[in-house]
Amino acid sequence: MDALDLIREAKKGDREALIKLIMDKKEEYYRLAFAFMGNKEDSLDALQDMIVILFANIKKLRDPESFYSWSKKILVNTCKNTLRKRKRVLSIGIDKEEEYIENYQSKELKHDIMTYLKRLNIHQQEAIILRYFMDMDYETISRLTDIPEGTVKSRIFNGLAKLKRIIGGEYQ
């Protein structure tokens, strides 16, 4: 059964079809949630919340071909809402699990990058993370965040310019 068939079944109330759709892209969903939440537990909680929301709203999906972008947008909004409720600043964490840390220098570099990113405003952080860490194109980021593509480009450009000033200022 292909993705469109699974989406049609999910719209009819088939939970297994919905779970299969999500499992087919589980790595992408997890990486996206992790980019926002910064740790495994919160990322998995966000994924669970996304599944509940998807199941409750799957019948509202007009275009079955847009399922994955629609579901990722729900995941991003779920992460943002969770962070907002906690009144936390967006914490774009690095993966702290030892299996992903090859050596001390790599860990230190990732930490430095995250430290610098946290000095940007939340919108610039989000755009830069989605573009360079999640490898998304401008159009996808625009759809995911519900902002015009030009605004995405502007946030990335201004964020990178600010990073350059921050980093340059510290090493001069």
Task: Kindly give the residue locations of the regions a language model identified.
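Sigma70-family region 2
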Residues: 11, 49-66, 86
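Arg/Lys-rich amphipathic alpha helix in sigma70-family domain 2
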Residues: 59-62, 73-92, 158
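Helix-turn-helix DNA-binding module
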Residues: 41, 115-126, 134-151, 162-165
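Short amphipathic helical patch at the helix-1/turn junction of helix-turn-helix
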Residues: 23, 34, 131-133, 138, ...
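N-terminal module of bacterial RNA polymerase sigma factors
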Residues: 1-27, 35, 114, 118, ...
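Internal acidic/polar
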Residues: 88-117
